[in-house]
Amino acid sequence: MSEAEARPTNFIRQIIDEDLASGKHITVHTRFPPEPNGYLHIGHAKSICLNFGIAQDYKGQCNLRFDDTNPVKEDIEYVDSIKNDVEWLGFHWSGNVRYSSDYFDQLHAYAIELINKGLAYVDELTPEQIREYRGTLTQPGKNSPYRDRSVEENLALFEKMRAGGFEEGKACLRAKIDMASPFIVMRDPVLYRIKFAEHHQTGNKWCIYPMYDFTHCISDALEGITHSLCTLEFQDNRRLYDWVLDNITIPVHPRQYEFSRLNLEYTVMSKRKLNLLVTDKHVEGWDDPRMPTISGLRRRGYTAASIREFCKRIGVTKQDNTIEMASLESCIREDLNENAPRAMAVIDPVKLVIENYQGEGEMVTMPNHPNKPEMGSRQVPFSGEIWIDRADFREEANKQYKRLVLGKEVRLRNAYVIKAERVEKDAEGNITTIFCTYDADTLSKDPADGRKVKGVIHWVSAAHALPVEIRLYDRLFSVPNPGAADDFLSVINPESLVIKQGFAEPSLKDAVAGKAFQFEREGYFCLDSRHSTAEKPVFNRTVGLRDTWAKVGE
C-alpha cells in the first residue's frame, strides 16, 4: 500500500487537499493547544492524532501550545504531563513548546487597538450582572450602562486594570459587538478579566489575563496556523474567532474547522467528573488504570500504537456519536496478541501434587510466542507439585468442560498429560489439594497408545513460583452512558477492580513496567509502575482475551 493510500480520509483532509491544490496554502501548519489544568484523556488523543498526524502526512508542522490564560487552575505539573503524553503517543512538535503567555504583550496591544477603534470597553458590571444582561437563547441581551464610555476613558480604565487598581470581579474588558445577536457568544464577550495570581510562566508580571476566545485566534495567527481544528462545542465561537481577527491589524487569518469530540462508553470525559473521581478517592489518582486518561491507559498496559490505531479507526466527522468501549479494547487486544510474549500465571491457585513424579524437577521449553519463532523460547521449571487455577478442576463435569475432572486426563501446557485421582478438602469442604498421576512419556507429545486428550491447562511449579499480586481491572462504570445518570457516582462498577494473590512463572521476576505479557488463557497483563516491588510484583490486567461484556449487553 502506498503512503497516499494508507492515509485516512476525512472532510478536514479534503479541505486541506483543496487548499493546497488551489494555492491558498503552500504548506500545512496545525497546532494542539491544551490548557494545562489537568491530565490528557483519550478524547485529547483523538485531537493529538488528528493535528500531529496531518502535519506528518502533509510534511507540515504542528505546534504544541499551552493555552495558559488562567493561572488559578494551571500548574507546571500538567505542562510536564502533557508533553510526556504527546511524546509517548509518538509525536514531536515543531520547534519549541509554545505558550499563549508568550503573546501576552501582543494580546494586550491588540486589546488597546480594539479600544481605540471603539470596539471594546471596560465594564464594571459584576459577573452576575453580566450573565443577567446577556439574555438567553430566546431573549436578547441588553446593553451595559458602561457600554458607551469614550475611547479615552476606556484606555485609562484598562490601564488601571493592568496596574492593579481594581479588585477581582470589579471590572473587565468586553468586546462591543451586538447584545441582540442570536449567538450568545457574540453578545459583548469578555476579553480580559482580573486575576491576582502568580502565573507558572510569567510570574506576577500580569494581573489581567485574556480570555480563551480572544487568545486562541490571535495565537493561531501569530504562529501562522493554516487550519485551526476544534471540537464541535466551539462551532459558535468561530464567529468570535473571525470577528477578532477581522478587526485587528494582523496579516494572517487562519480558519477554524470543527470536528466531533470523542465520546466513549462506560466512562466519563468531563474534567469536572474525572476530578471528582480523584478527589473523592473513587480511584487512586489521575493515572488509575480505570481512568480514561492517557497516563491511566499507559499504566494499564495500553500501547501508543493501539491508541493511534483506535483514533484512526473511529475517524473524523462532524456528527457527535458514542464509541463502544469494545472498539478501544479490540485495538489493544489485537496489538498485544501480535506482539506480547507469553507467560504463565495462576490467578486463583490450588495445589496439585503428581504422586508418581520422581525427582526434584526439570526444565521444559516453551515458545515465547506460538506464531513467532523469532521471539525465541524460554526454560520453565516443572516439578511434582504445581499450582493450577481453581476454575480448571471439577470433581464432576459435562462433556463441554475441557479441563481437569476427577478420574480423567488433561494436558499441562507444554508438559505432561496428568490424571486426577483424588482430592483433599478442608473442614468447609473446599478443595485444598488435587492428587494426580502423570504419563511420563507425554512430554510435549501425544500418548503412545493413541488416546485423545483434548483439554490443556496452564500451571506454575510450586517450588519455583513467584508470588504476585494480580489486579483485575474492568470498566469503571456498569452502564454504557454514566453521564446520563442522575448521579454518575452511583453507577460505578463495584467489580472494576478485583485484587488476587497468585503465582507466576519465575521468568516474570525480570518484567519491567510498560512491557506487556499474555498470561496464557487469562488475558494481557503488565507490571504496575506504582505498586510493584522486587519482592512482590504487581500485574495489571490490560484486557481479557475476549470481550466478556458482549454477552452482558445482549
From Swiss-Prot:
Stored HAMAP family: Gln_tRNA_synth
Organism lineage: Bacteria, Pseudomonadati, Pseudomonadota, Gammaproteobacteria, Enterobacterales
Alphabetically ordered keywords of this record: Aminoacyl-tRNA synthetase, ATP-binding, Cytoplasm, Ligase, Nucleotide-binding, Protein biosynthesis
Membrane-spanning intervals of the chain: none
Gene3D superfamilies named in the record: Glutamyl-trna Synthetase, Domain 2, Glutamyl-tRNA Synthetase, Domain 3, HUPs, Ribosomal Protein L25, Chain P
Catalytic activity: tRNA(Gln) + L-glutamine + ATP = L-glutaminyl-tRNA(Gln) + AMP + diphosphate
GO-annotated molecular function: ATP binding; glutamine-tRNA ligase activity
EC number assigned by the record: 6.1.1.18
Annotated Gene Ontology cellular component terms: cytosol
Residues annotated for L-glutamine binding in this entry: 67, 212
Motif 'KMSKS' region in this chain: 268-272
Primary localisation category: cytoplasm
UniProt superkingdom: Bacteria
Quaternary data: Monomer.
Chain segments carrying region Interaction with tRNA: 317-324
Compartments, as annotated in UniProt: Cytoplasm
Natural source organism: Shigella flexneri
Name listed for the protein in its UniProt record: Glutamine--tRNA ligase
Protein residues bound to ATP: 35-37, 41-47, 231, 261-262, 269-271
Chain location of the short sequence motif 'HIGH' region per the record: 34-44
Pfam families, sorted: tRNA-synt_1c (PF00749), tRNA-synt_1c_C (PF03950), tRNA-synt_1c_C2 (PF20974)
